[in-house]
């Protein structure tokens, strides 16, 4: 049909010919009337891709000769495909033996350093464990924890999960990425009923990094119904994210609204004194003695990055034990000698173009590949321009070098960077681009940044 073909040609310009051929032209046109187009996909995964990437474009661009929107209905061919009973059973077994979030026993409340900055989330999560022991309902639901990388969100989540499980509460702990993987597996194997039972027949659901669902319409739809089912039955939902609910990008408003139903709690990274106290406690447990100025040196050398410091102390403890120095006070010279390789590696850690691309992609809720890709869709063009601007600003790379990173000629790079500069020169601090640059600059320069954003 003509309208569908015109739509496909438009998409070739936005997302590329190869993508259209793979995902859209392979859809079979079953039937068309004035306002309805019926398509058949080869499998459920193609249906999911259509819903997440194309559905919103159809609503905006596909119209008939009378200017009325055409409703597109996509069904899956594999719904009617026969399977052998043994094959079905194998798929069920494979899907439901997937891991679903083991917790680290060391991540307990007892091992968490409570400071004035993070006292509130600790007290609330501990109180919830007590409430569950008494068989009472949860006073705030959901609990939404948000804060930068290395602020302790995972530690708090796992500590709370451990406490609830000890109290006999059936608790499921997953990352948003794992939730998405489970959903895709369920769709592909026709096991949505079992998927829903798996996620809803619990008393508490803990889900990390909810921003991973950004831009994934079909996954958000399923999580919306999962959330509603649990909340209606008074079951606890605990969510973590780098962003406050209102700052989530490409997330449905109805989900954001529900995230704000209960209580949203910021989780702050340890300030320097708190970090030092935390590390002093850790050295006692590891049975090593470090002179105060030597510990200050180590904190400075590793840029106050908590995970790097914990790794360094664990390595130091092993080497101290090997050299039988457990009772000896360690000074800066000893630290430099015993951790020479660790400190040398830390010096080589630097911000890179690929690190900027990953950080920008995460901020906008898209993949790094799409930022580096050829699509001219606005949802990818803007992150690409922002990443180019940051490469120029933060790394002082030449236009030619940036062009090599993004597989573009230098004139395209110049125009992209100029476009972002012009938006910033408008002096509107509330504009989306200005907020993006400010937030990404903060993340990339923060002493508590995640090593996901840097490479050695």
UniProtKB/Swiss-Prot annotation:
Q: Which InterPro entries match?
A: AAA+_ATPase, Chromosome_initiator_DnaA, Chromosome_initiator_DnaA-like, Chromosome_initiator_DnaA_CS, DnaA_C, DnaA_dom, DnaA_N_sf, P-loop_NTPase
Specify the inducers.
In infected human monocytes transcripts are present by day 1 post-infection and last for the 7 days of the experiment. In patients with confirmed synovial Chlamydia infections, 7/8 had transcripts for dnaA1. In infected human Hep-2 cells, transcripts are visible from 11-48 hours post-infection.
UniProt xrefs under PROSITE patterns: DNAA
Task: Quote the record's binding site residues for ATP.
Answer: 150, 152-154
Q: Where is this region: Domain III, AAA+ region?
A: 102-320
Task: Using the UniProt annotation, give all residue ranges assigned to the region (Domain I, interacts with DnaA modulators).
Answer: 1-68
| Localisation per UniProt entry | Cytoplasm
> Where is the region Domain IV, binds dsDNA?
321-456
Cellular component per GO?
cytoplasm; plasma membrane
Broad class of the protein's primary localization: cytoplasm
A GO molecular-function annotation: lipid binding
Could you tell me which residues belong to the region Domain II?
68-101
* Keywords tagged on the record: ATP-binding, Cytoplasm, DNA replication, DNA-binding, Lipid-binding, Nucleotide-binding
Report any one BP term from Gene Ontology: DNA replication initiation
PANTHER family, per the entry: CHROMOSOMAL REPLICATION INITIATOR PROTEIN DNAA
Q: What is known of its domains?
A: Domain I is involved in oligomerization and binding regulators, domain II is flexibile and of varying length in different bacteria, domain III forms the AAA+ region, while domain IV binds dsDNA.
Q: Main role?
A: Plays an essential role in the initiation and regulation of chromosomal replication. ATP-DnaA binds to the origin of replication (oriC) to initiate formation of the DNA replication initiation complex once per cell cycle. Binds the DnaA box (a 9 base pair repeat at the origin) and separates the double-stranded (ds)DNA. Forms a right-handed helical filament on oriC DNA; dsDNA binds to the exterior of the filament while single-stranded (ss)DNA is stabiized in the filament's interior.
Q: How does it assemble?
A: Oligomerizes as a right-handed, spiral filament on DNA at oriC.
Assigned protein family: Belongs to the DnaA family.
Full protein name: Chromosomal replication initiator protein DnaA 1
Question: Whose protein is this, by species?
Answer: Chlamydia trachomatis serovar D (strain ATCC VR-885 / DSM 19411 / UW-3/Cx)
